[in-house]
Amino acid sequence: MQFSPPLQRATLIQRYKRFLADVITPDGTELTLHCPNTGAMTGCATPGDTVWYSTSENTKRKYPHTWELTQTRTGALICVNTLWANRLTKEAIQNEQLSELSGYSLLKSEVKYGAERSRIDFMLQADSRPDCYIEVKSVTLAEQEYGYFPDAVTLRGQKHLRELMSVAAEGHRAVVLFAVLHSAITRFSPARHIDAKYAQLLIEAQLKGVEILVYKAELSAEGMTLKEPLPMTL
């Protein structure tokens, strides 16, 4: 995926009200960006860090600029726009970059499923193969070389794991894919120090047939692609 038009660079002043961030451009102009991330953004929003933002052609938007990437003072790149995790996953599946998810003829998005009537991110279908249900999670929380999910207690994420276990019990493929959007992360682990219940459910889900995939995105201000499998520790 290529950014078009190219991203623009600025320096972060502050993030506030969850959805907004003030930045200053190289020529000294102050802008307010839309922040498409409602999470804690731990380590992703330090004042003084470099941010890369896009600009919408929609003149009716109150905040036409969107915060896409953070570049930390150590040089790490982080994709803070949570919408990209699904977009990159879809692109990677369609281009058959993810070997475990290749060979399907049909891809559907946002399909209702399960007893709790969740919406699955993707469902893959093919003749003579069980349907494959895929839930995508964005990973940006980094501690040393490890990436962790979630960065806050997630009841919604817990529900998704329960639904995936039900899907696996019915004979379908059930997959949770952790999309690592932080260049410094080289391994993945559930954040039991933040949400012990989610970590416990993830282990239970694997034991009950849910497949766990971890793929890292190659990030730059020019574009991104999801392609590198990472090891995990549950």
UniProtKB/Swiss-Prot annotation:
Give the superkingdom in one word: Bacteria
Care to name a GO molecular-function term for this sequence? DNA binding
Task: List the InterPro entries.
Answer: SfsA, SfsA_C, SfsA_N
Q: Which Gene3D superfamilies match?
A: 2.40.50.580, 3.40.1350.60
Q: Which NCBIfam families match?
A: sfsA (TIGR00230)
Family stated for the protein in its record:
Belongs to the SfsA family.
Output this protein's name: Sugar fermentation stimulation protein homolog
The organism is Citrobacter koseri (strain ATCC BAA-895 / CDC 4225-83 / SGSC4696)
